[in-house]
Regions:
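Binding-site signature for planar aromatic cofactors or substrates
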Residues: 2-203
């Protein structure tokens, strides 16, 4: 659906709307410092992947905590924390396709998507070993995203929310587990995706 925009001369309201409208829906050559700063200020991001099978389940996972870093103009990394599933890792292992998305829930509306090729690497991989992630016990590895498309859109229909704080429940859950219990949990819960694709954890 197209947008019909009427801008009246010398009307600051319509001129402002025009500038805002024309600034959205862009495709970028890279992740600029300004865009990287905007990404860092978002409290949640979403990860979308899918298997190759036509009847396979598309997966979308919300992510929080201080787990994401912009490494350079075309590369993003985030910590893969222990969870109840292994969909993202199983999918990128099979076909590499991945999209990250952020929404502005505060401030001016905006949606940013970074699509490309993903891979899960070990925490001691030379490409990420010097990245300053917080120490999250139970991290399964790092997901690297090599961007081939970077774009934004308006986000005019996304509601506003106030950020109250991070949840502690996952960190508390991990703190109550021994190393052996975490290994047993991953062996049981993270071995395969819901479609039967192997997870193959790096740790």
């Amino acid at each position: 659906v197209g947008h019909l925009l009427t801008v009246r001369e010398n009307d600051p309201r319509t001129e402002a709307r025009g500038r805002e409208h024309l600034s959205m829906g862009r495709v970028y050559d890279d992740i600029s410092p300004a865009l990287a700063d905007w990404i860092r200020r978002q409290h949640v991001f979403f990860v979308a992947t899918a298997p190759l099978a036509a009847d396979g389940h598309v997966n979308v996972s919300p992510k929080g905590l201080d787990t994401l870093r912009v490494l350079d103009e075309r590369t993003i990394a985030y910590l893969d924390l222990t969870g109840s599933g292994i969909e993202t890792v199983a999918h990128v292992r099979e076909n590499g396709r991945i999209t990250l998305m952020w929404c502005a829930f505060e401030g001016p509306p905006r949606i940013v998507r970074v699509s490309g090729r993903g891979e899960q690497v070990a925490l001691d991989d030379p490409r990420v070993v010097e990245v300053e992630f917080p120490e999250f016990r139970g991290a399964r590895g790092v997901v690297l995203v090599h961007a081939d498309r970077i774009a934004d859109s308006c986000g005019y229909a996304v509601p506003k929310y106030r950020f109250e704080g991070e949840r502690d429940r996952l960190l508390d859950w991990v703190a109550d587990k021994t190393d052996d219990e975490l290994i047993d949990y991953r062996t049981t819960k993270n071995a395969v995706s819901i479609d039967g694709l192997p997870g193959e954890l790096t740790v």
